[in-house]
Amino acid sequence: MLRQFWKPILDQYKVDLVLSGHDHIYARTGDIDVTNIKNIPTGYQQAYDPDIGTVYVVSVSGPKMYEVTKGQYAKRFAENTQLYQIIDLDGNTLRFRAFTATGELYDEFKLQKREGQPNQLIESNF
C-alpha cells in the first residue's frame, strides 16, 4: 500500500534518497533493472530508477536483526549487523556512508545532481 501511494509522489518530486527502517537488515538499491526479478520485497519494487535517480535504503540499529536472503534487487546487503549512517551535502553532491557499530565503513555512494537530468549514482568500490 505504501508503494502504491508514495512511489508516484516520490517520482513526481524527484526525491534523491528514501531512508526507511523496520526490516531488521541493511539493504540499499543501486543501478539495477528490477523489471524481470521475481519475489522482490515490498520496498524495492522500483529499486533505483535511473530515469529519476532515487536510491532506497533500509537500515537497522537496534538489537533485533534478521538473516537476509540475498537477491538481485539490492546493491548492498548486511545481516546481523547494526549500522548507522552519515549523510553529507556539498553543493550538488550527496555523500552517503554506512558504518558498523564498531565504526567500520560498510557502504558508501554519492548522488550527483545534474541540471535537467536524473541524478548520477556514483558507487564506491567494495
Language model segments and positions:
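Long, structured stretches of catalytic cores involved in phosphate-ester chemistry, encompassing
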Residues: 1-105
